[in-house]
Amino acid sequence: MAFQYQLMAQQLRQKIQAGEITAGQRLPSLRQFAEQQNISLNTAKSCYEMLEAQGLIYVKAKSGYFVQRPSAFSNCAIDAPKHPDFKSEMREVSTLALQIEIHEAAINSKLIHLGSIQLSSNLVPAKALSRSIQRALKYSKPEDFLYSDRQGHIRLREALSAHWAEDGFHISPELIYISNGCMPTLAVMIQSLTSEGDGVIVPTPNYNGQLQMLALLNRKIVEIPANTEGFDMVRLEHAMQESGAKVCLLTANFQNPLGFCLSNAEKEKIAQLAAKYQCYVIEDDIYAECSFSAQRPLPIQYWDQQGYVVYCGSVSKSLSPSYRVGWFCLPTRLKPMHAKIILRNVSVNTPLQLGLADFIFSREYRQHLTALRPKLQQQVQQYREFIAQAFQGVDFRLNHPQGNYALWLQFPDQINSLALYYFAAEQGINLVPGILFGEDSRYNNCIRLNAGHELSEEIQQAIQLLADWVRAELNNQAVA
């Protein structure tokens, strides 16, 4: 059953697409819209956020919401899987060998990297980071050069707690554990909360790195369908209740690869379902800081009242991919597992922790994010516009993220993304074929591209090569 804000968004979308509300027209303010429709302010906000995520409207600072020009939201929607026989049942990840092959190709520095989701070095505040590390070392104490607390240095835990509090998200430093990046964190929690052969509930399509990690840990998956508006909440509840899986691995804010951001109502619902069915949610919130708006969205953990949500994150997507520093927040309910988890969580380099703590406390991180967010938004829009131009005449769909910098392209069913991947590799181009993001070759007509680098002439030429291949493939099949 749809939420009220989804029904309101559908009605507004129909009016925009029918021309009843024209491009450039200003919409009622959130308060006015709530009063007109006799709905709560939160429902109105969720409605506008959904339309913004779909590229139908945009917000101007201190001016309000406006209808986007049509060219900006054409080809923006990705359908949910069109498989009537698609069942959310426990199964093994079948693409492990291919996952490993493509992962190794992604670190080849000689390739044009359109695949791996990472920031350009031009967006990394290298000088400011160096200053923070130098300050941290200058004012460090003798004990900072000994083995550190396995939970992580208290200075960094306090810095993260204070940083999140500014965004209305409060977690005690005592509940924060520092790790060597987000993926090791997820692996630690999967190993701690499940056993080999157990199932883990994941949306589909889902980040291929997570699927690879689950396969290597000999965990099965229970897939629930997702699209650019989020995932099927009814199927999620059914999976929690019936599948036998007692852990979900979810990203609520700017999911990779689709880029959706769940509404606050949906996040609260997930926290409630987790408690109702005693199904732990491991929340990967690695992209929250990459929001295109000034305010980062709240995580599912914000609504967790019973201790069934484990909050995880890292700075690798918002600061630097080389800073392999992550964290997880252990709810009080799981404190008895402290020793078991600490044993699996390898200690993190102490000077690096102190440097990052200085970077946060000095507000350099906040300033970096303030500059980064509009830059990412601009880059993503430039990529979308160039892709629309390059693939002109091709029946394709393209997501419209409001955070994150992953672009998900869906082509006609005749396109084999694995064949496109091998063609691109021969041309010195790296991309990620959609087949890696789910089972049953469900996304073999999709690819994921990275918009974290400036749209250079070299990248434009690479995208044009991909478009030419797709167009030629469709023409050849049409003739045949």
Q: What residue spans do the PLM features occupy?
A:
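N-terminal small-domain helix-loop-helix segment of the aminotransferase-like
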Residues: 88-180, 188, 361, 430, ...
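N-terminal basic, amphipathic alpha-helical segments
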Residues: 1-134, 314, 342-348, 382, ...
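Conserved glycine-rich beta-strand-loop-beta hairpin in the small C-terminal domain of fold type I
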Residues: 374-384, 396-410
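Short Gly/Ser/Thr- and Asp/Glu-enriched loop/turn motifs at secondary-structure junctions
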Residues: 60-62, 173, 400-404
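Conserved core of the PLP fold type I
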Residues: 140-277, 282, 288-290, 295-303, ...
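Conserved core segment of the aminotransferase class I/II
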Residues: 129, 305-374
